[in-house]
Amino acid sequence: MSVSYNRVIVAFCEGQHDVAFLSRILLVNGFLLQDLKIGQLPPPFDKRFEKELSQVRIPDKKLGFQPNGPKLPSVCFYNDGNLIFIHNLNGDGRGRERVELVTMYKELSGTDDFSIEIAYRFLYFFDADELGIDARITEIKNEIGLEEATQLSNGSIIDFDGSEWGGYIFHDVQTQLGTLEDQLLGYFYNKNQQLQQDILSFLQTNVLIQERTRRFISSNAGESYSGRSQYYEKKSVLGMYAQLQFSGVSNAVLISNTDFLKAVDINRC
C-alpha cells in the first residue's frame, strides 16, 4: 500500500451486518476498499497484524475455526489521508476485547525517533435494542473512561486522552429503540411498501412453534432441540429480501449489494 495516512479511524461493530452497512456508507462517500494482503498494509499495522496471526495456537483450535478474530480488522478503507479499519466484535458485550484493541493500536504510536506518531479516532457502533440511545451512549462513555459531565451525543466526536472518540447507535426513528435492521427495513419499505407487507404476512402466517426455532440435533442417540430460539422476525424479513435478489446469500451480502439501499438513503443517515 503506497498511500500515506495522517489519521487512523478504528470502528468497532457488533456484527457483520454493521460492517456491511458501514462499508456501503464509506463507498458512497468516496472511500476506497483496500483489498490487500496483511503484508501489504502500511507500517506499523502490517507487522502488528502479522504478529496477531502468528500468536494463534493452531493445535489448540478445532476444525472450522476462523483465524481472523476481533484483533484483525474485517475490512480496510482509505480516502484523503484517512485510513479506516473496521472490526467485527461479534456482539455488544465485548468490552474487554474493545479495550484490548484500543491498547493495541495506541501502543503502535509514539513520539521517539523509532516510532510513528499516529492520530487516532475510535468509533463505537451499537444497536439501541431495548436500552435506548442514551443508555448506549452512557455505556460508551464508561468504557472510554469519560467523566459523567462530559458531553457525548449520538454521532458526535470528542477529544480525550490524546485521541478522538465517538459513537453511533442504530435505532428505529419512531421509537428511538431497536437495531440496524429497523433502519434498513425503513429504507426498504420506502422502495416497495406492498412487498414488505407481503413478506411480513407470509412470515406471520407460517410462524412455527417456538421449539422448532431452536437448534435441532439428530444422531444415533436420538433427536432433540437445544439452546434458545433463533428466530428474529426482522432478520427473517431481511432474509426474504436477500432470497428474492441473490439466492442463497446471507443478510450481510444483501446489505452489501442490494438496490433497496441507495446513496440517497445513506446520505440521509
For the regions a language model picked out, list residue spans one by one:
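Activity-critical C-terminal alpha-helical subdomain
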Residues: 117-254, 259
